[in-house]
């Protein structure tokens, strides 16, 4: 049995989020949350928030035991890029790219492992 949670349009680069995800991929959920809690990256807070949502979905929608859950799949897709302009000298302008990310976390029972 699997439970899924998706957080969309997070204002962080997908590359930065993937660096955090690589650390917790495949871990039991309680250990992953403890690991994310002590990571200094902003992406760790967003991944932890999505993971907590997936755990809640598993407990309430599928009656799964929290102690049996592990991270089956976790990935970050690129969302739309916000484009802004910054005025520069002599009437020029530079383009500023503000990337967004879609975070997906799938948790499953250890019995499925």
Swiss-Prot record:
Domain of life, per lineage: Bacteria
A cellular-component GO term for this protein: cytosolic large ribosomal subunit
Keyword rRNA-binding: yes
Single GO BP term: translation
Keywords assigned by UniProt, alphabetized: Ribonucleoprotein, Ribosomal protein, RNA-binding, rRNA-binding
Transmembrane parts of this sequence: none
GO MF, one example: rRNA binding
Pfam families hit by this protein: Ribosomal_L22
Oligomer status and interactors: Part of the 50S ribosomal subunit.
PANTHER family attached to this UniProt entry: CHLOROPLAST 50S RIBOSOMAL PROTEIN L22-RELATED, LARGE RIBOSOMAL SUBUNIT PROTEIN UL22M
Family: Belongs to the universal ribosomal protein uL22 family.
Function: This protein binds specifically to 23S rRNA; its binding is stimulated by other ribosomal proteins, e.g. L4, L17, and L20. It is important during the early stages of 50S assembly. It makes multiple contacts with different domains of the 23S rRNA in the assembled 50S subunit and ribosome. The globular domain of the protein is located near the polypeptide exit tunnel on the outside of the subunit, while an extended beta-hairpin is found that lines the wall of the exit tunnel in the center of the 70S ribosome.
Protein name in the entry: Large ribosomal subunit protein uL22
Originating organism: Chloroflexus aggregans (strain MD-66 / DSM 9485)
């Amino acid at each position: 049995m699997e439970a899924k949670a998706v957080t969309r349009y997070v204002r962080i680069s997908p590359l930065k989020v993937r660096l955090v995800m690589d650390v917790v991929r495949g871990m039991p959920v309680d250990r992953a949350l403890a690991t994310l809690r002590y990571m200094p990256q902003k992406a760790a807070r967003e991944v932890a928030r999505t993971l907590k949502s997936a755990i809640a979905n598993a407990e309430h929608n599928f009656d799964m035991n929290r102690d049996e859950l592990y991270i089956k799949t976790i990935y970050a897709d690129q969302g739309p890029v916000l484009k802004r302009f910054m005025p520069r000298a002599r009437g020029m302008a530079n383009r500023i790219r503000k990337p967004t990310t879609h975070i997906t976390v799938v948790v499953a029972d250890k019995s499925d492992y």
